[in-house]
Amino acid sequence: MKMVKICSPATSANLGPGYDVFGLALNNPYDTITVSIVEEKGGNETLSNEKITISMEGEKCEEIPTAVDENTAGVVAKKMMEDFNIDKNIQIHIEKGIKPGSGLGSSSASCAGVAVAINELFGLELPKLELVKYASLGEAVAAGAPHADNVAPAIYGGFTMVVNQDPLEIIHIPVEFEVLVALPNIQISTKEARELVPKEIPIKDMVNNVGKACGMIYSLHDNNVELFGKYMMQDAVVEPCRATLIDNYSEVKEKVKDLVYGITISGSGPAIISLPKKECVLEVKKIFKETWDCPIYYTTLGAGAYVVKEEE
């Protein structure tokens, strides 16, 4: 059976003032996506009414639909196979290491992973920008509209900026630093969280966010994590609207203010991403644990989705 297995990373989007633009890929947690061409022992393709079948295991997999048109990865695979006239039966198996609804790009990891897998399995040789375009289509299932702020880092790795939506333009910057992520056991719907974001904002808030976002980009010139974190905490638009969705978030920010370079909500939450001072990692972990009693990840930034196994 011809197959390819992909490791696809968790991602953190927005990062304060970079709403729907900035994203980071993390080394941990991650999803594993296996895509196989289904054949009988004799080598003939298995006859089926469904060209694509999906199976799941892992984090909250029972809550994720496996119908192709309702599954983020299924939507991506179907569109790619239609566009490139791929007349094969495939099996998609997703091992969820990223909790759905976490604010860590769970759906994006599946979308990106299957896009990379289809590209590899059928030798399409698509550039990363095209893979992001396809992967972002799956995000419409999870968020109500296609958006690329999570799938871009899930494919490129490191730090990405979605500088234009149509036509899609992405800037990728390789960066190296460690983040500490807390995942409170709180349910937040991506769609509901997006609805909290104001449709119009005061010009002073726009000026603030543009300035702080520019400062963050400048800080990456020499990997200045202290400056990056400082500006990451100064979003005047989105974080204030969403902070109330996460119990004790404001109190935790106050407790760790001298222990981290920066802290903010990851994506639509509930995950919290922080940039701890190296000597303060254990203390910040303790505060997170005592407050939320939740999973905590201390991780470097990661590569984009990549092949871990391939069989002809």
From Swiss-Prot:
ATP binds at K99, P100, G101, S102, G103, L104, G105, S106, S107, S108, A109. It catalyses: L-homoserine + ATP = O-phospho-L-homoserine + ADP + H(+). Its main location: cytoplasm. GO terms for biological process: threonine biosynthetic process. InterPro entries: GHMP_kinase_C_dom (IPR013750), GHMP_kinase_C_sf (IPR036554), GHMP_kinase_N_dom (IPR006204), GHMP_knse_ATP-bd_CS (IPR006203), Homoserine_kinase (IPR000870), Ribosomal_Su5_D2-typ_SF (IPR020568), Ribsml_uS5_D2-typ_fold_subgr (IPR014721). It is found in: Cytoplasm. Its EC number is 2.7.1.39. GO terms for cellular component: cytoplasm. One of its GO terms (molecular function) is ATP binding. Pathway: Amino-acid biosynthesis; L-threonine biosynthesis; L-threonine from L-aspartate: step 4/5. Gene3D superfamilies: 3.30.230.10, GHMP kinase, C-terminal domain. Keywords: Amino-acid biosynthesis, ATP-binding, Cytoplasm, Kinase, Nucleotide-binding, Threonine biosynthesis, Transferase. Belongs to the GHMP kinase family. Homoserine kinase subfamily. Catalyzes the ATP-dependent phosphorylation of L-homoserine to L-homoserine phosphate. NCBIfam families: PRK01212.1-4, thrB. This is Homoserine kinase.
